[in-house]
Every structure is written in structure tokens, then in C-alpha cells.
Amino acid sequence: MKMLDLYGYTSIAQSFDKICISIASPESIRAMSYGEIKDISTTNYRTFKVEKGGLFCPKIFGPVNDDECLCGKYRKKRYRGVICEKCGVEVTSSKVRRERMGHIELVSPVAHVWFLKSLPSRIGALLDMPLKLIESILYSGDFVVIDPIATPLSKGEVISESAYNQAKDNYGEDSFIALTGAEAIRELLVRLDLHAINANLRSELESTTSEMKRKKIVKRLRIVENFINSGNKPEWMILTVIPILPPDLRPLVSLENGRPAVSDLNHHYRTIINRNNRLGKLLKLNPPAIMIRNEKRMLQEAVDALFDSTRRSYVSNKAGSVGYKKSLSDMLKGKQGRFRQNLLGKRVDYSGRSVIVVGPNLKLHQCGLPKKMALELFKPFICSKLKMYGIVPTVKLANKMIQNEKPEVWDILDEVIHEHPILLNRAPTLHRLGIQAFDPVLIEGKAIQLHPLVCSAFNADFDGDQMAVHIPLSLEAQLEARILMMSTNNILSPSNGKPIIVPSKDIILGIYYLTLQDYVEPEEILFFGDFSHVEYALHNKDIHICSKIKYKMNYCTDSSDGNGPTYYSKIVETTPGRLMLWQIFPEHKNLTFDLVNQVLTVKEITAIVDLVYRSCGQSETVEFSDKLMSLGFRYASQSGISFGRMDMIIPDTKTMHVDNASEKIKEFAVQYQDGLITKSERYNKVIDEWSKCTDLIAKDMMKAISVYDEESKLNSIYMMAHSGARGSASQMKQLAGMRGLMAKPSGEIIETPIISNFREGLNVFEYFNSTHGARKGLADTALKTANSGYLTRRLVDVAQDCIVVEYDCKTHNGFAMRSVIDGGTVVETLDNIILGRVAAVDIYNPITKELLVNAGELIDEAKVEKIRIAGLDAVKVRSPLTCEAKKGICALCYGRDLAIGDVVSIGEAVGVIAAQSVGEPGTQLTMRTFHVGGTAMRGVETSNLIAMLDAKVKLVNSNVVEDKYGNKIVMSRSCDVVLLDSVGNEKMRHSVPYGARLYVNDGQLVKITEKIADWDPYTMPIITEKTGIIKYMDLIDGVSINEVLDESTGISNRVVVDWKLHLQGANLRPRLVLVNDNGDIITLSSGLEANYFIPIGAVLSVQDGQKVHAGDVITRIPRESIKTRDITGGLPRVIELFEARRPKEHAIVSDIDGYVEFGKDYYRSKRRIFIKPVDDKLSPVEYLVPKGKHTIVNEGDFVHKGDLLMDGDPDPHDILRVLGVEALANYMIAEIQQVYRLQGVRIDNKHIEVILRQMLQKVEIFEPGDTMYLVGENVDVEEVLKTNSNMEKIGKSPAKYIPILQGITRASLDTNSFVSAASFQETTKVLTEAAFSGKEDSLYGLKENVIVGRLIPAGTGFLMNKIKKLSLLNKDDYSMYYNSEYQDLASIEAGHACSVSPSQGVSDTSGAVDY
């Protein structure tokens, strides 16, 4: 324990392990109190002294001044503990006025508003009475029968006052007991036998068959059991004594004009005391009952107002209005409440803020701190040094010396700040890189200087941004700042493991310019053998930086025979600029000259920084980055790149492309007028045509702009965009191409595009259309920033207690990872997905059977390369979702800590990192919406499938018919085209929609770019399987089908309308039937009749009696016009997924494998679908689909478990129920990543998996077995496993359960820690629940520990807790514990020296000392 004392660790905050909460009994309130308060007086208006016996009474609460009684008789420390015989005040510290409580003895009991009105009403549940009735007893003067004695009245019956008087007259004065007000409720609660109620409810639960009744019983039973288990008594919910807060927590402050500013609580207490005293006096006078009842009601309302003003039945002033008085609940909840304002976030001393300016001369670990600021911040340090050196005798003189800025002060300041890191923070701090440590360098001026490379981590720019400075004071804080938070230790981004200290903007432009090469061949190419000669030639202007030269490059390789390295040289064709860049590279065999001998854009430069980090380690990377930055800045200035109007080159082909598009659009208009296409089809085709036209113009513009010109060399704007320094192809397209389509605020695309570009200038109409996008961008920014910030807060709250608690949980479970293919193209390779994960099983090469990776081994870059060469298409890796560690996760299931590039350290708060990684880009993207200027960024709908490589085709679930033109038409709803390589490994898989034309056969070999299939992207067809004659069934004009006349074309289409709106439409089943020449219904290959059911909104393509051929389209269902997809649409999608909300019109998922059969009858407004299982012994599963919804299956189709039966997004809860956790994880990850990928943001899957793990912490009991659980109860997974294990040990049957998915808000509120839940949302509800359940908080998470003022149990705090545990054990336990846990921990920590070791710090050459 001595070691802990060294850090002052055994403070009060450390001396307890749990926090318990329960309802305060009247006895405990009196025991806590130092005296009863009966007087409302506060201070004397003349002397301003506090009044005795009043709300600030010093006799009860303690002295106002330290060690001084009220009358002044005793005035020194030596009298401590003495109680003055004159004024009765104890002589002690005035601090006791923050701790000592008082109380009010109520004349009549009152109900506690939290237990009465916080839904579900706890009092109501115990008494089995509706809240309305209880309120009528409390507030309206109704009576409740407590004991009917010999009358026909029943116990608990509520009667009005007139009925009560009538009963008294009928049965006599004492023939029954009935009471009103809180006394009545209290009497009922006192008489409750909770154990008997519990037994009755359990037997009722077993016998009931009604689901609704069962839910009601379970709710009540849970409350009854909580009361029994917690030891709380029901009558304690009715107050007979009210505690009074210590006076210093509700102070009386005098304002400048002498008037007192009174805390709202004092107002509430005065009202209660006044009404209580008045009621007491009234009772002595024996007045009419109505007066007493009214006074009791007023007392009840006054107490309600004190505890929770918002829950009173009559609220005179609503929250936020002028006369509103804050209640105790208001003090706790919300952003300004005690939890969030004072406990989770505090204002800090030793801090300052100022504007930031760029500091290009700083090293990466430095920041420029203004001298004046440093002087103020380090004042106490300077004072102590001045005293220590004997320069001044007192602190007062030292302060004066600092104020006068004497020369000695500056010398001491230099000494003080040496090796003393400071923290810089820029708001909003969206991820952990928003606060970093730097070594301060004193500068003149008043602005903080920031290193340019850390700007992207802070998301800072120099247009007036401000940053805050904080000083770590204690030795431990300085140590943590230097080892963990130093900017040089934060090179990689925690969200994706890519370098975040990468050059950008000017630096990129400078390096790009440096690596350019002249396109014009020189008359003679000069040879150089040494770099000094190249520098000499450059100085003499014999060559230019971009000139082509030949250079003798020396190489060194390790010889295979083990005789040491071999040296050789080679002539390379390069430029002086590239050689100059090569000089700053560190020496390593992975870093070859080929890396530099190319034009470097931002992508290549990022890859180089990454490679340097992986190969040479941290200190080399830091040095390299600094040198790269200096070089970039230098050559960006020297290049003379500028931005001119004539640099925006408008392509000559623009007019041609616009004319062609206009012609096509006229064609579409004609087709529409002829009735060949519908209105929405025409709209979609127009949008697509303009998108194509814009893209063609952009392509031609890029071609024109990227031409190398002998006079002006490369185009400046092209260089900026191509290098990735500033601007994008889409912005250039708007400058010199064509602005393109614009979106309305609703998200619809306006079909008239903006043909002009910014160089030509927009006309009035085009300018007006542009305003939509600009305005939407600004409005989005304002609204969505708040949404995104709130999402981050919820994510942090749900994941904050997810910490790495052990190295290996020994599980063999995991998920099979595959590359992500979207629209036939690989959007995320398998390499990227498995890098940094741990193999769940041994991985072998499928051909050579060579072992590539052992189970439990980390897959690093080298192993990824092996797996790629082996051609594996799926790899099983461990995942946080399958981790079996208790109260956290294990290091191996998490894998690599992306910020350090090695297995994650034990004690790492991976939950918070995951939440920040997912939340941070959301905010960034929403702030960035308007940069594209709102031009419609919609891609052209994919309508075909092209082979991306030479391969063999494999068709899965293909059911094909041939139409009259000989085309193969896909009739299957789940047809997949798989492309296999020569070995037979799956390289690409694409689903082909129903109705597509197929150009290949199963087993056919295809060449790259060969077309495999195509389809109409704007409509969903219904296609005949056989040749025959169409017959309309239940398609009645004016009821189920309408001739919809298009006014603009005069053409009418036959559209199916909602037939349920008509009286005669109730039993209709609109369908097309296929008959033969005799009029008999044709039987399909599945053995079913050819009935084609038509949904609402479908357009019929055939007439009644028309002959059709197999493969003909008989009905078209238009798809909706596609809206613009940007993160504005994307952020709500991410929120919807994390909140596990049921999509508005969600698709129905098949629970089993089987054949589709449509029910013969309609069930009210629903349509029946049966899935008939393959096994005839099993009964079919019935689904009810809303009438008119388009089912995407036909009668007789075979569907697999988990297939969709109708259009729409599947419900995540259904996926979990039907297909399990892995399928749910795959779906959620795919959907969330799709939104981020659309914006070019990369987040590692493991972060989403960590959040999902927290969302899957609860299970639902469906069979309790011999346990005490109830059916339908939601319980923690760990708790159930523990209970089941105990049950099995004693030979009893365990509980059976299914996993459930909770949204992040629900999961945060259902956490085991009531302290954490209360500080999140619904504070009063959470505390009410916790109090009557007598909950314990074991303080496992981060938030709870911050609130109680301890070190968080992550990082340093995690190890401290280990040491604390060790120190409390006796010798035998100690050695056992040490061998099992600590040994393991020590070995891992040693292995993780890379994250904290001195050698990884900044090396001497960069200006810092090894620490």
C-alpha cells in the first residue's frame, strides 16, 4: 500500500468499492439531520447576520465564520468543539455548512413525486391502482376504503366525498375506515404483504394465456421483487419528514445594490415551512374538513415543486419561463445539471487560450508559447524558484518581481519550462488527437504557434482559430503527457491506422512540383555520379529541378550466402528534384529509390510516411516528416504556382456534348408523349443523360487542362487538383466544365442543369437554381453538426466501459472476413480488412497446404502479403463480438491498436476510441456538405454487369427463360453470377436482378470488359414464364385499375390503384392470369397456376386477351426517383442503424427455407404468404404483407432462410433473430461503412464491432427453467451465464434465452451502472428506478469513476487497480494472483514498450532530450 500512498492514492475516493442507493427512511433522514427547522427567516435585514432557527440557522448548520460562534464569545481554534452556552453554536470550521443537513417534520404526510408520477408509477404498481385514481385521492379529495369492516364496500375502493358522506349516513360513523390524501395511500402501503403479492403474481403468471395481461403482471412483479430484495419499505415513498440541503449548497449572495440573490431552493423550502406551519395551526382549531383538505393539497404541491417542478399536476410557470423556480431534479438533469456541468466536466486552472498562427520553423514536438502567457501560467513555479534561489524572501515580493518583468524572471521561466510539456486543445475535441502535448518554445507576440503537420489531427486552420493551453502539474501528469500524449507519439490515426501527421496543402504542392519531370526530351541528358555535382549544376542553372538527368545510384543488398552485404551501382533516369527528396530518406532496405522516382501526389506521400513508420520506427518518421515539410514549403514558394483565369480551360467539345444531350432529352419527351415510358422513367432518363453529359465534359476538360505546354509548363490549377493539395475534379468541373445538375432542398434533383461554368458566368435563371444548393449546404451545416455531436455523445456513453481487461480469452470463435464488393467492383480488399486482426484458426495455403498463420497470431503486413499471394477469398479472424472476456474484451480479439501498430495494450479504453472514430467523421462530413456547392453528386444508375477480369462464370440459383428474340431472361429472385479464377477461387460475386438479360452460360469463360448481363434500372418488371393469353382478374375499371391520363402527352396508362378504398373492392385480388387457347389456366414449372398478383402503382403493359410470349414484360413497377446521396442523407442512416430502429417500411424476412405459396384469402388489409418448408412434417410459416406492397417473390419460388419477401430495408432485429449475430454484424458493418465510404472516410471495422458488442449485451429469457427470471425479461448476458452455471452445478434446469439488439440510447440507459445512466439522460427516471431497487454500482466504467473523483480504470488507473488488489492480498493469495494475472500482464506490458518506451521518443537530433 506504500506505493499507492506515494501517489496520494488512498484518498476518500479510493476507500470504497461500490456506491449504493436506496429510499431514505424517515428515521435515516432524522439521523442525518442536525435539527428541525420551523422558521422561514434567513438573515437579519439590518445586521445581515443569519437568524437562529431559520433556514440558515448556525446552531443547526454550523458557524458562518471559521472557529467563531454567532455572538462572538468564542473566537479561536483552541475552542474547537465547544458549544457556546449563549448562542448555542458549535465552534468549528465553516466548511460544515456544506455537509450538515436539517429537516422539516411534516404535519401531514405527502407523496414523493418521483415515485408517484415517474412512469410507470411505482406507488400505482404496488397498489395495483391507476395513476388517475391515486391523483384523485391526493389532490381532489376522493376517499379510499382502507378497511370495509362489516360494510359491502370493498378494500381499496375509491369513492367521492359525497359517496363517503352517504356511506357514513347509511352504515354509521365507525362502521368502516376510509381516508383521503397521502395518509390514505400511506396506510394502504403499510398494510401491503409483499411476499403474498409476489406468490400470487407468480401463480397468476403461470396460469395466464393473454400476452397483454402477462406483460402487465411481469411489470408489477419486477417492482414487488425489487422492493423485497432491496429492503426498502413501500411506505417510505410517502414522506413524513423532508431533508433540508446544507445552506452553503443553496447560498444567499448579496448583489451590488445590496439586494440578496436567493437560491430557488430557499423559495421552495419557505413555501413548504409556511404551509406546514399553517396546517399545524389549522388542525388545532378543528376547522371544516374542506379547509384542511385544501391546505394538505397545497402542502403536497409545495413538496412536489421542491422535488420536481415539471411533474406537478398544476404548473404555474413552465421550465424556462420568467417565474420558474428550479427544483432539486432540475439541479441534477440536463447539460447545466450537477452531473454534466460539475462532475463530468470542470473548468480548469493553469490554463489559457489564444489565437493560433503557423510555426513552420518548429520541430514536430514543439509549439510556440507567447512569453506573457507562459509567465502567467508558470507563475507559481517561478515564485518557488525565486524563493529557492534566495532572490526574494516572500511570495508577495516574488509576485511583484514577476509583475515588473525583471530580467531574472525570464531566466527562471526558461528553466521552468525546460522539459515541462504543455497540452494544447482545440474545440470541438472530437477524438483523442484533439488534445496533444508539446514542448513549449518561448516566442514574442500574443499568438500560439502551431506546427503545420498537426493541423489535420486538430482539424485546425489559421483563419482565426483559437486553442487552449493546459499545464500538467504533477510529476505523473507530466509523465503521461510526455509518454502518451506527445505529438510525436501520435503519428497514426486511431480510427484507421493510417498516418495522420502527413503533409497537406502547400507542402504537397511543393513535393509534387519537386518530383515533376519535363516532358520535352533535352538535347542531351547529363550524367551525374554524386549529388554534390547535381547541386552545383542546379546552382549554375545548367539544369532545372524538373530536368531529365541520369544518375549513378548505389545499392546494397544482403547476400544469400551469408558473407555480409554486397554493394552495386545502377544508372537511373530521374530529376534533380527527386534526388533532392531522396537525400532526406532514412536508410532502410524497404525504402528504395523507386518510391521517389515518380510524380508524388498526396496518396503516394501518405503511403511513403506509412512505410517509413513501419520500417524505421517513430523517431525516424518524426525527423523525416519535419524535413519533408521544410522541403515542401521551400519548393512551393520557389515553384511560383499561381491561380489565373486563363488556367481554367473550357473544352472545345462542350457545345457538342450539350447539343447531343439536348437531342436525347427531346427524344425522351417524344417517347413519353407516345406513352412508351412513364413520367418517372422519363425523369430518371433525363437525369441520367445530363449526368453522363457532365461527366463527358469533365473528362474532356481534364484532358485539355492536363496538357504539358512548352511555354507555361503544366497548368497551375491542374497541378493543385492532381497533387491533392487543394480542390477536386468536381470543383474543377464547375470552374471550367459545366456545373451540372442541382438538388432541391428536399433532395430531389432539378432536371434542368446549369450548363454554364464559373469562368463563363451563370445567367440569372442558373444563378437562381444554384441558390438551392448553397442554402441547403449552410442549413445542413447548422443542423447536422448538433446531430452528429449528439451521436458521438451516445456512442461514447454506450461504449465507455469497454476496456481491454486481459490478453487472451482463449476463444476459437470468430467471423469469416471477405473483401467488400459493391456493384461488381471491389471497394474494400481482404488485405485491408484482415490487417491487424488475429487469426481464429490456422490459415493454410489451399494449394501447397503450407501453414501461413497460426491460430491466435496477429496478421501483420508480411502475413497479409502471404495470404494475398495464396489467393484466399475468406479468412476467419477473431472479433470483439465473439470475445468471451468478462467485463470488457481481450487484446487478441481486438487485435492491433491502430494508433501504435501493435497488439493493443491491456487497460486501453477501446470503447471510447471506437466511439470517437465513428462519431468524429460524422461531424466533419456534416460541416463539409456545402463545399461541393450542392451540385447533384448522383452516380448514373448501374444497369449492366461487366467482367472485371478474365474468368470462368458460375451461375447460382439461375432460373432462365428464353424470350421471342432469343434472349435469356432471369426468372430467379436470388440469381448470383460468380467469377472464378483459374484455380477455382471466387474473385467476384454479383447479384443479377429478376428480369435481367443474361449473355453468358454456366461454366463459360469470359474476357475482361465482356458484358455478362444488363437490366432496366428504373422499373421492376413482372415477366411471364410461358407463352399464352393474358386474362384480367379482379382488375375492375374505377375500382382496382384506372386510366391515368397524362395531361402533357394526352396518353393514358392503365395503373393499378388502391382497391381497398372502394366498398366493392374489399375482397378483390387484382392479378393477371395466363391461359391457353381453351381458356384453361396454364400450370408453371413449379406446379402452380400462372397467377401474377399486381401491387398498387404498377403500370400494365398488356391488354386483356393479348397473346404474350415467354419472357415478355406484362407489368412495370416504377422505382422512385433517386435522391441525392450525401452524408446529410447518410448521417440519419447511421443514427437509425446504431439506434437499431425498425425501418419505416421494413421488408419481411423469411424465417425458414421453403417454397412460397400465396394464401387464398385476404385477412382484412393484409395479404397472406406461406413459406412451405422442405420437410413436410413441419408446418408452414405464415406472413402478412400489407395489401398493394410489392412482393419480390412469386408463387412457387424457393426462398432461403433470411431472404426478403418484399421490397424495403430489412429490420436488424429480424436479421439477428433469423440469421444470428454474424449475419447481423455483416449487415450493420456493410450499411454503416457504405455511408462513410461514399464520403471517402475510412474507419476500421473493429470500431463498429466494439459498438455492436455493447448493443448486444442483453438477452431475452423465453424459458426461465428453475431460475428466478421471468419470461420476456431482458437480462445481462454475463449474469445469465453465471446463473445458468450455478443452476447446472446443483442439478437444476437453466434458463433459455435469445440475444436481443438494443439501440445505443437504450443500451446506455440499461447499463449496470446507475451513476453512468443518470449522467446520460432521463436522470430522474434512472435514479427513481435505482433507489427503489436498492441498486449497487460497482464502478467498473470510466464515467462512474470520473464522477466519484478517482483515476479511471483504464491505462495508468488499470495498473493502479491491479497494484491495489495485490496490496490487499495476504502472502499465499498474493503469489497465486501474481502467477496467474500479474505475470501475464507484466509480459504484455514489456512487449508493449513501443507505445511508451524512451527510445521511441524524439531523438536528440530533433532538439529534445531522450526521456
Curated annotation (Swiss-Prot):
Report the GO terms under cellular component: DNA-directed RNA polymerase complex
**CDD domains given for it?**
RNAP_beta'_C, RNAP_beta'_N
Q: What is its EC number?
A: 2.7.7.6
- Amino-acid positions noted as binding Zn(2+) 1 in the UniProt annotation, renumbered to this chain: 69, 71, 84, 87
Domain of life where this protein originates = Bacteria
Q: What is its cofactor?
A: Mg(2+); Zn(2+)
Quick one: which residues bind Mg(2+)?
A: 461, 463, 465
Function recorded in the entry: DNA-dependent RNA polymerase catalyzes the transcription of DNA into RNA using the four ribonucleoside triphosphates as substrates.
Protein's UniProt name: DNA-directed RNA polymerase subunit beta'
Can you name the source organism?
Ehrlichia ruminantium (strain Welgevonden)
UniProt lineage: Bacteria, Pseudomonadati, Pseudomonadota, Alphaproteobacteria, Rickettsiales
State which gene encodes it.
rpoC
